[in-house]
A protein has these predicted regions:
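Electrostatic interaction modules used in gene-expression and signaling proteins
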Residues: 1-114
């Protein structure tokens, strides 16, 4: 049914637009800009912003709960120093992979220090 397909497409677009607006308001977007991990061109890319809001920022929230905002800043400074040209072209994927690898380490450290 064409109408169902069109409705679904519109819902997806609305959902993406909502994620983009949330990402624009997010303190993490500002931190990524300050660390030069996001460029002004990335800010114009809906797919990147929606991807960050959906897949990366919830993980930053987890890190923030464990280590505070400074913990997030330190993580971003660290991964900025490790960044290569490939990751600049796939920034959302790079940021997601980096935090996914880092969070278990932080959680393990917390368990060891209890």
């Amino acid at each position: 049914d064409d109408q169902a397909y069109i409705d679904d497409k519109m819902r997806q677009e609305e959902s993406e637009n909502e994620l983009v607006l949330q990402a624009m308001d997010s303190p993490y977007t500002k931190l990524l800009m300050e660390q030069f991990l996001l460029s002004y061109l990335d800010l114009m890319d809906k797919k990147i912003l929606a991807g960050l809001q959906k897949n990366v920022y919830p993980l930053y929230d987890e890190l923030k709960d464990l280590r505070g905002l400074n913990g997030v800043k330190e993580h971003l400074a660290y991964i900025r120093d490790k960044q290569d040209d490939y990751s600049k072209k796939n920034i959302a994927k790079y940021l997601k992979k980096s935090i996914e690898q880092y969070l278990p380490i932080v959680k393990r450290q917390d368990i060891e220090h209890e």
